[in-house]
Design a protein with these regions (language model features):
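Bacterial Sec-dependent N-terminal signal peptides
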Residues: 1-21
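Carbohydrate-active catalytic/glycan-binding domains of CAZyme proteins
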Residues: 20-364
Length: 364
């Protein structure tokens, strides 16, 4: 009986030819480029343009030191990857937000149909500031090959309340001050978080934005989903028509539940949000939410993962859901904090059960 490897399943799902090299890419192992080096593109995404796949991600220094920027790898078959170098570089200019020594995470690139530009959004932390900045960076390029030009960095939706906050909700949020709660995870503190304490705190300067992804809907509208409010609550932010800014329209998802690493897909009219808990570099069980509208309400479901190590998302953390037609791949990283550049990649097909609920089953 003919035995198919995991990656042959991926290739068949995406209508790609099988090759003799298919067994080189089992999930969670070393995936090499044309130079025999592990693909150093983490927390990013893949887009398909013409006959080429473009894989963007965090380029983590292989020898220690500052991050060089965002890397790009290309492939014709999703098996053989070519290192194209750095397409968004950190710079020496100390007045620039992306000066060397900053932290760039979770870069995502999408094509904007309204401008025909390729837009990159990424989580940015300023040099020497730890994770206090919690900003979004914007860059763009006329070509998927780059290079990308850095445009600006900011916190989203300054001066704007969530769309569903009525006057009474704003009053409740303003009634809480973080300095009045010395201890986290008390019932009163949790209530204050749910009622928007951190939204009110950050209203003037903009909301925090850390782990993030981009989702482009069927109508061409784009949304940025990010961990906000001290990583306690997800925000879904509508992007402007050129994808280079925020309209100010946003909602909160799962207030106080501590989600990060958001990924999003839409299948048969339902939006599915697959996330991670907040446990640093250590893996944890994936979470899942659904809604009939991007604006919610969102309902929580059990983890979509099945098989060995499902309780730790196969020892990984999601970074993107790559879609081609109605086929989806869940992309994840197995973080290696002592050498992040060597963190293995996990790509697994997403299937749907009889009720249309996503399932991610381990295959090797």
């Amino acid at each position: 009986m003919l035995r198919f490897s995991f990656f042959s399943v991926i290739l068949l799902l995406f209508g790609l030819p099988l090759t003799a090299q298919e067994s080189l890419l089992p999930p969670g192992t070393v995936w090499t480029d044309q130079n025999g080096l592990h693909v150093n593109a983490h927390g990013g995404n893949v887009i398909h343009v013409g006959d080429t796949y473009y894989w963007y991600g965090e380029s983590r220094s292989r020898v220690g030191g500052a991050m060089p920027g965002v890397s790009l790898y290309t492939s014709k078959d999703m098996l053989h990857w070519h290192d194209c170098g750095i397409v968004l570089s950190t710079v020496a200019d100390t007045a620039c937000p992306i000066q060397r020594g900053c932290v760039i995470e979770r870069p995502k690139v999408v094509r904007c149909p309204h401008t025909d530009n390729y837009v990159m959004l990424f989580h940015l932390e300023l040099k020497g500031k730890g994770y206090a900045a919690a900003m979004m960076g914007f860059a763009d390029s006329p070509s998927p090959e780059g290079p990308f030009t850095f445009r600006r960095a900011l916190r989203p939706t300054a001066g704007k309340w969530p769309m569903d906050f009525k006057r009474k909700d704003r009053k409740l949020a303003r009634g809480h001050r973080p300095e009045d709660y010395k201890d986290w995870w008390t019932p009163s503190w949790e209530k204050a978080v749910r009622e928007g304490m951190y939204v009110a705190r950050d209203l003037k300067g903009g909301q925090m934005s850390r782990d993030q992804t981009i989702f482009v809907d069927d109508d061409g509208k784009a949304y940025q989903i990010s961990s906000s409010e001290e990583n306690l609550t997800l925000h879904i932010n509508e992007l402007t028509s050129d994808y280079m800014g925020f309209t100010g329209r946003y909602v909160r998802v799962a207030p106080g539940e501590m989600n990060e690493a958001p990924t999003l897909l839409k299948h048969n009219g339902t939006y599915w949000l697959i996330t991670s808990g907040c446990t640093g570099w250590a893996p944890n069980e994936a979470r899942m939410y659904s809604a009939k509208s991007i604006w919610g309400p969102w309902t929580r479901h059990p983890s979509p993962c099945r098989g060995p190590k499902a309780k730790t998302t196969f020892d990984g953390q999601g970074n993107y859901i790559f879609r081609q037609g109605q086929r989806f791949i869940f992309m994840a990283d197995r973080w290696q904090p002592k050498k992040l550049s060597e963190s293995p990649h996990i790509w697994l097909p997403i299937t749907f059960d009889a009720e249309g609920v996503p399932v991610i089953e381990w295959k090797d």
